[in-house]
Amino acid sequence: DNDKNTELRAAYKAMLASLLETAGYADGAAAADKVIALETEIAKAHWDRAVGRNRNLTYNKVSRDELVAMGGDFPTAALIDGFGLGDQANFVIRQVTPTAEEVAENGLDAEQLAKVSGGGVPGLLKVMQTAPMDQWKAYLAAHLLIDTSDVLPASIDNTVFEFYGKTLSGLEEQRERWKRGVDTVENSVGEAVGKVYAERYFPAENKAAMDKLVANLRTALGENLETIAWMGAETKAEAEAKLNQFTPKIGYPEKFETYDSLVVGNDAFANQMAVNDWAYKDMLSHLGQPIDRTEWGMLPQ
């Protein structure tokens, strides 16, 4: 702890108190204390950052039964079903107490082991079981307002910006409303915007020309690999395999997301909830499916 952290906590509590009073709590400060108390316990369940960067420790494939067992008395099975994951047999979780073999393989000393024991997912599930319900209610109310502040009344948006924008990030003022509105649309239905953008500014003949150029570059690179003297046969084979697996993505995707099942109206908050619901269901639809290498992780615009 230091003076800076004390100041930040005070500012954070002030923001929470204001938001929770807006949400209907008579004593915003008392409700804010409940949120901070819960978040402190959640933080204690997190692993030490340095140890948590060890990939050998953070890839843990477990069965549904094993995950449920980690929760003890907490209804983990109901949580899994509530997330729409009831048909999944296996899960990959990042943080679970390492086995004796993993401790030895990764050379964890006693201090490091203490930082990853009893916490992680099992620790979080324990907090979910033991923390008072009124803490969870205040926590969820506050974070719903924080997470959706950009589509809520200006008083809420300004309160959130005052802490996250000014106090934490040192920003003097919010970006213009229209710019944030554009970001909201792009983050919600970005490929629909991208389709219009591509039609206007990157016609099909331009894409065809660039596709041909990239294909020629790939051919030239492949021929160059065959003649490189300093590269061994095994390394060449690996390089050629990597080149053959490369999927060029020029201009815009071959097929755009249509957002067929997304319904929006004139209510900004309701639209945000609809987008979140659509995005989550879309993510679930990919489970167990082959990787779609034509899908883009960026927007044309």
Residue ranges and their predicted role:
Residues T227, I250-E257:
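Amphipathic alpha-helical coiled-coil segments
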Residues D1-A208:
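Noncatalytic, helix-rich "gating/capping" subdomain that lines the substrate-entry/channel surface
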Residues L16, A32-I42, M210-L221, L225, ...:
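Short amphipathic alpha-helical coiled-coil/interface segments
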Residues A50-V68, Y259-K281:
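Long, compositionally biased
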Residues T97, E105, Q112-G119, K137-L145, ...:
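Active-site-adjacent "gating/activation" loops or surface patches in catalytic cores
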